[in-house]
C-alpha cells in the first residue's frame, strides 16, 4: 500500500457547502485550497480512491493534478503561450486520447473563462500530435482511455491525466456548455438532466 500523497481537484456542488468538511474527510482527503465556487484542491494518499459509494454522489467530478500554475491569467503576460508550452513540457510523450480544457467557474455569466479555456486548448493542440485535434465531441471519448484535462480560471491553471470514468464525466469539470444563443437551447434543468444521462455512458 502506497503512502505517497497526491493532489486532486474535486468539484463539490455549492449546495453541499454546509457538509463540505465531512465530504472531504469521508473521501479520505484533506482540503488545501478552494478554487472558485465549487472546486477544491485536496490531498490524499495514493492508496485511497475518491470514488467510493459514501462520497461518489457528492464529489461531482475529480481529477488528479499533475501540473499546476497558480496565477491570474488575465494579468499574466502571454499566459496562453506560456501555459501551453508548460503543459507540453510536462506531458510530452504521454499516451492520451484527447486534450480538453474548461473553466474553473462554469457558472460565470461573462464569456472570459470559456474563451480562455478554448484559446488555451487551441494552442496546446499545436504542440501535440495532430490526431488529438480530431476530437470535437467529448462524448466520443473512450471512457477507459486517458485524457489530458485542464481547468483554468482566476486562480490559475490545473491539469491532470485520467480517464473520463475516473473523473466522473466526459467534460472538463463535469459541465456541458450550452450556448444561450442556440435556437435549440434547453433549460438549465434540462442541461442537468442531459449531464446525468451522459454519466450512463461511462460504464
Task: Describe each PLM feature range.
Residues 1-203:
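SAM-dependent transferase fold signal centered on methyltransferase-like domains
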Amino acid at each position: 500500500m502506497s503512502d505517497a500523497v497526491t493532489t486532486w481537484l474535486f468539484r463539490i456542488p455549492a449546495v453541499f457547502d454546509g457538509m463540505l468538511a465531512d465530504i472531504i474527510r469521508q473521501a479520505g482527503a484533506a482540503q488545501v485550497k478552494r478554487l472558485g465556487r465549487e472546486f477544491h484542491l485536496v490531498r490524499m494518499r495514493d492508496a485511497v480512491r475518491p470514488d467510493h459509494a459514501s462520497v461518489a454522489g457528492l464529489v461531482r467530478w475529480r481529477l488528479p493534478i499533475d501540473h499546476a500554475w497558480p496565477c491570474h491569467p488575465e494579468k499574466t503576460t502571454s499566459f496562453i503561450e506560456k501555459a501551453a508550452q508548460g503543459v507540453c513540457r510536462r506531458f510530452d510523450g504521454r499516451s492520451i486520447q484527447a486534450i480538453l480544457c474548461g473553466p474553473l467557474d462554469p457558472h460565470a455569466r461573462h464569456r472570459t473563462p470559456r474563451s480562455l479555456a478554448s484559446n488555451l486548448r487551441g494552442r496546446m493542440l499545436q504542440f501535440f500530435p495532430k490526431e488529438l485535434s480530431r476530437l470535437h465531441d467529448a462524448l466520443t471519448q473512450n471512457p477507459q482511455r486517458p485524457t489530458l484535462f485542464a481547468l483554468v480560471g482566476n486562480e490559475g491553471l490545473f491539469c491532470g491525466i485520467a480517464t473520463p470514468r475516473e473523473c466522473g464525466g466526459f467534460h472538463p469539470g463535469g459541465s456541458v456548455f450550452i450556448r444561450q444563443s442556440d435556437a435549440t437551447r434547453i433549460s438549465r434543468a434540462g442541461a442537468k438532466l442531459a449531464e446525468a444521462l451522459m454519466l450512463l455512458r461511462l460504464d
